[in-house]
Amino acid sequence: MEYTTQLDAAKKKIITKEMKRVAQKENIDVEILREKIEKGYVVIPANKNHKSLDAHGVGEGLKTKINVNLGISKDCYNIEKEMEKVRVAIDMDAEAIMDLSNYGKTRKFREELIGYSPAMIGSVPMYDCVGMLDKELKDITEEEFLEVVEQHAKDGVDFITIHVGLTRDIAQHLKTTDRITKIVSRGGSLLFAWMIVNNKENPLVTRYDDILEICEKYDVTLSLGDALRPGCINDATDDLQIQELINLSRMAKRAYEKNVQVMIEGPGHVPIDQIEANMKIEKTICNNAPFYVLGPLVTDIAPGYDHITSAIGGAIAASTGADFLCYVTPAEHLRLPNLEDMKEGIIATKIAAHAGDIAKKIPGAKERDDEMSRARFNLDWEKMFELAIDSEKPKKYRKESQPIEEDSCTMCGKMCSMRTVKKVLNGEDVNLI
């Protein structure tokens, strides 16, 4: 029996090779996984043309995945530098990479990225419209927007972000809102400008059925973008954000009916006390669709440290329903991240994802922590390094500060609690001098 998408296969009770691979990685029964995909609770972004893909699942009961953003811009147009980031991100086990290139002819980079990457690849076709078409935004037609979407799908992109919750009606309300940061979504702002200048409805909304046909043809997962995500904590959970989410829930249902896999994108900047509510609202009104969040950042006053503000919010979000975290780097709000910024962002986001998985009792999550604890008690430094999310920094710290006693560190020396207790339990003398 043939199928068009992973969702179509799941509805037809077919187990695909991608489902088998994801079930193996997640250590769950493949039939349980298929049922979750059939219900729309899990997606496996897997474009038919992404031949190097090692499939991952995103959604209920699975490990929280992380995404790394990169891409070329007008000020930093260097494909080789971005490919170096790609290689490092994959070495650091990032499950997804989004190509957010927004200047010039980006297809060469996209093709190289997809040809190389075993990680799932996402993109925002809206960013590519001006460069690909060589036209000013206001002059781009609905048909041309579709051309760009199809080009990305044909090239092998596994999931695309499209902003179909932003409508003319909401755009009018935005003119009078007391929001501080208005729209911080780049794609959302471009659509807002196009709609206002042309006095027309969002072209991605009016041509949504055509987009669904493209996605079904190539098995592209839709990541329904939140053009009105809060860009500061003051704007969190306001009427515009919730109205857009309601619109996205309806668009998600239409995608599901056409056998197109779908996940929902979320905030953003959210105070700690509102994060759990945001997760529950999305899961409730969007039929438990996988939730993909940017952060969320829990305060606005830490430029240079937003990988930390994001990790705090990301851990809470992951523990209360988020399935997919978009990384944030120390360079957020300041510049295009360099390689070191990217590494710090990945590590911080992986910590948040793992902390959330422990709280969600994802199989295997706490077990790794228990192994680390046993290694610490045994003062087994090599095992500790092996189990660490990042092994480079602990190895560096250990090497730079060698203790006199090998079975301790320079913090406590002979007064190491683990060392003392082990000696007592083993019947050995405890000599501190």
Curated annotation (Swiss-Prot):
Its EC number is 4.1.99.17. GO terms for biological process: thiamine biosynthetic process; thiamine diphosphate biosynthetic process. It is an enzyme of class 4 (lyase). Binds 1 [4Fe-4S] cluster per subunit. The cluster is coordinated with 3 cysteines and an exchangeable S-adenosyl-L-methionine. GO terms for cellular component: cytosol. Belongs to the ThiC family. This is Phosphomethylpyrimidine synthase. It comes from Finegoldia magna (strain ATCC 29328 / DSM 20472 / WAL 2508). The gene is thiC.
